[in-house]
A protein has these predicted regions:
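Alpha-helical context
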Residues: 9-16, 25, 47, 82-89, ...
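Active-site segments of SGNH/GDSL-like serine hydrolases
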Residues: 34-60
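C-terminal regions of proteins
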Residues: 59-140, 144-160
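Acidic-and-aromatic substrate-binding clefts and catalytic sites of carbohydrate-active enzymes
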Residues: 23-29, 55-62
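Secreted/periplasmic serine-hydrolase-like ester/acetyl group-modifying domain
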Residues: 1-43, 128-161
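Short, local alpha-helical segments
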Residues: 17-21, 51-53, 90-99
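N-terminal start-of-chain detector that recognizes signal peptides
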Residues: 19-21, 49-51, 71, 79-80
Length: 161
């Protein structure tokens, strides 16, 4: 679907300890990010930076936390979902121990971001709009595929228990 791959499963992540420290050095990609933000604003769009949770080690979290420094400097909203208590459970919402959310985790993140964007921006709901019928159809297909694959995974989990 749209270049993505649906992967089902659960992981045994490494122990996760949240850090608030941030990387002091300029990171790869900061220049490009500044250019993207400037281009968005030139086109009348307001960018939003996000930090999507995964079982990151301390060094990775410091890089993620640096985004807040940049967001503050550039006056860009930053939604750091690492700091939303209870949003993602790395035991059940990731399909690998490194960084990828499974459909349950992705659904939680999508719902949270959708609500956040709705509260902070004037966005219209396009569901049911005939001009976006292909999105409704794609969602229906995704949900069917997800139910089948998640059901298969649950069956496998039951056999392994």
């Amino acid at each position: 679907m749209f270049g993505a791959e649906l992967r089902i499963g659960r992981s045994e992540p490494a122990p996760f300890v949240r850090t608030k420290e941030w990387a002091q050095q300029t990171l790869n990609g900061e220049g490009a990010l500044r250019e993207i933000i400037a281009l968005c604003r030139d086109k009348g769009m307001e960018p939003v930076l996000t930090g999507i949770p995964y079982p990151a080690d301390e060094a990775q979290q410091q890089v993620i936390n640096r985004a807040q420094v940049l967001a503050d400097e550039l006056n860009v909203p930053y939604v750091n979902l690492f700091d939303v208590e209870g949003l993602v459970d790395f035991q059940t919402d990731c399909y690998d121990a490194a960084s990828h959310l499974n459909p349950d985790g992705a659904t939680k993140i999508t719902a949270y971001l959708g609500e956040w964007l709705t509260v902070h921006f004037d966005l219209a709901d396009k569901r049911g709009d005939v001009r976006y019928a292909h999105w409704d159809a794609a969602l229906d297909e995704y949900e069917k595929m997800r139910k089948v694959q998640w059901g298969e995974m649950s069956l496998i989990d039951g056999l392994l228990d």
